[in-house]
Amino acid sequence: MRSSIHASRLRKMGQSIPASTGPMARSANRFLQNRAAIFGLVLLTPLLFAVLTYPLWLPYKPNDIDLMAMNSAPSWKHWFGADGVGRDVFARTMEGGRISLLVAVSSVVLSTAIGFLIGAISALGGRWADAIAMRSVDLAMTLPPVIFLLVLASIIGSGIWSTVVVIALLSWPVLSRMIRARLLELREREFVMASRGMGAGLGHLLFRHGLPNSIDILVVYATLQVANAILLEAGLSFLGLGVPPPAASWGNMLNAARSTAVLEQFPWQWLFPGGALVLAVLAINFIGDGLRDAFDPRAELN
């Protein structure tokens, strides 16, 4: 009664009644108020635009060779200069960004799917499923990551999709633990117990209850993991175990410029791909941190 009287008074005074907002809207508002996250978006947007659209407006292809431009410095003709065989460094930096992002996003999609399924099955599948899933997670997390990465890459071989598989197999255990912790709490709630009582199968529990209640974890994990995957791809390619030449990636461009002569005399051959790598990782981390803070349940209390 009092609320209706208060609402009528607000209407008479010409004031609007504040509309209630859901948790997703509040999370979006917190994200938009995060200056670091917005700064990350400002950094990442032009880089993504250039990486995705450069074939439409750049006259050079990544593997076009101009023998007259070998090791030439940045100029109006070659904005980032040319490498040791006359290839345009700007075109290769943009193509390297496309391949690095393709590898990163693909590996994150794969690792997110694996991590969610194993974590959800562990939480909702019963005692034996939990024991088997968690022992596999423990085994994966006890392996030294660098050694495991190098051994797996040498077994599977180099290539774009091989690199995707290698990074995904290294990245899923942390997510599976987070999903398991979230869904162990969820399975004790009445609506999940009611679904179990009505004979709902594991697939129904996973995708009807588990997935919608894990979206915040998945979004934050995937965003932060993209930056980590870009670094892993660059490291593998730098060591010759990732994307093989002549395909361009930021890692193998840095590998090609590792000689002392190039480092000292032709710094544009490593400075621009290295700068793009740092810029992309920094921007994505800012965005991921902003998403993590926006979805943090403690922010609701503050």
Swiss-Prot record:
Q: Does the keyword Cell membrane apply?
A: yes
The cross-references to InterPro entries, in alphabetical order and at most eight, read: BP-dependent_transpt_permease, MetI-like, MetI-like_sf, OppC_N
Q: Alphabetically, which GO biological process terms does the record hold?
A: peptide transport; protein transport; transmembrane transport
Name the UniProt key words of this record, in alphabetical order.
Cell inner membrane, Cell membrane, Membrane, Peptide transport, Protein transport, Transmembrane, Transmembrane helix, Transport
Topology of this chain in the membrane: Multi-pass membrane protein
What Pfam family is a match, any one? BPD_transp_1
Please indicate if the UniProt record lists Protease as a keyword: no
Where are the coiled-coil regions?
A: none
Gene3D superfamilies the record matches: MetI-like
Subcellular location, record wording: Cell inner membrane
GO-annotated cellular components: plasma membrane
Transmembrane annotation, as ranges = 38-58, 101-121, 147-167, 200-222, 230-250, 268-288
Residue ranges of every copy of the ABC transmembrane type-1 domain listed in the record: 97-288
Q: What does this protein do?
A: Probably part of an ABC transporter complex that could be involved in peptide import. Probably responsible for the translocation of the substrate across the membrane.
Q: How does it assemble?
A: The complex is composed of two ATP-binding proteins (BOV_A0347 and BOV_A0348), two transmembrane proteins (BOV_A0350 and BOV_A0351) and a solute-binding protein (BOV_A0352).
This one is known as Putative peptide permease protein BOV_A0350
Record the organism.
Brucella ovis (strain ATCC 25840 / 63/290 / NCTC 10512)
